[in-house]
A protein has these predicted regions:
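Catalytic domains of carbohydrate-active enzymes, especially glycoside hydrolases
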Residues: 41-57, 100, 169
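Glycine-rich, positively charged N-terminal anion/phosphate-binding segment
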Residues: 35-47, 64-72
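Alpha-helix-loop-beta-strand connector modules within alpha/beta enzyme cores
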Residues: 64-84, 122-139
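Conserved anion-binding
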Residues: 10, 16-25, 98-169
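Hydrophobic faces of well-ordered beta-strands that scaffold small-molecule active sites
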Residues: 2-10, 54-56, 81-87, 105-107, ...
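Glycine-rich, proline-tolerant flexible connector loops at the mouths of alpha/beta enzymes
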Residues: 51-69, 109-116
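Active-site loop-to-helix "anion-binding N-cap" substructures in soluble metabolic enzymes
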Residues: 43-47, 73-74, 80-84, 88-117
Length: 169
């Protein structure tokens, strides 16, 4: 078994939130834990302990007043460990994270429009960052007997069913 470390940043703080409680309105979330340390502290700790394959997730929406502070923390943490980074990733800002030391960028919301994958947007990201440095997050929620991809900080269900056909695309 491998341990994959994660750093979630919300409202400028590293924290663990209660799953599904994140709301864009008012930048709210129920919290399990809020750290006194910043993202760079945890990135250095993970590197010191040789933990690989981790990621940093910016939990505020791109248009949140907290996004810029969250982004600064993520960028400061990246040189310490070559982590993956996700949250508000677009073709316009993906290079900033990769140039700062991210091993990959993680994307979901940008490539989904009106409940479906927008393959033009996905191809644009592939063109900008390269297929080998792009992670398409297909986080999902069970609805009946199916698992549907969920986007926008786990707030919006899509029409995309997670199955073999989707994963092969």
């Amino acid at each position: 078994m491998e341990f994959r470390p994660c750093i979630d940043i919300h409202n400028g703080k590293v924290k663990q939130i209660v799953g599904g409680s994140l709301k864009d309105s008012g930048d709210q979330a129920q919290e399990n834990f809020v750290s006194e340390q910043d993202a760079a502290f945890y990135a250095a700790l993970y590197q010191k302990n040789k933990l690989k394959g981790g990621h940093i997730i910016l939990l505020n929406s791109y248009d949140s007043p907290y996004y810029e502070e969250t982004q600064k923390q993520a960028l400061a943490a990246l040189p310490a460990g070559g982590l993956q980074v996700g949250g508000g990733i677009t073709p316009e800002n993906a290079g900033d994270y990769l140039n700062a030391g991210a091993s990959h960028v993680i994307v979901t919301s940008y490539v989904f429009r009106e409940g479906r994958i927008d393959y033009d947007r996905l191809e644009r990201l592939v063109y900008v960052v390269g297929r080998e440095r792009l992670v398409l997050d297909v986080s999902c929620k069970r609805v009946g007997e199916k698992y549907l991809v969920v986007t926008d900080r786990w707030q919006k269900l899509t029409e995309e069913i997670v199955n073999e056909s989707l994963l092969e695309k």
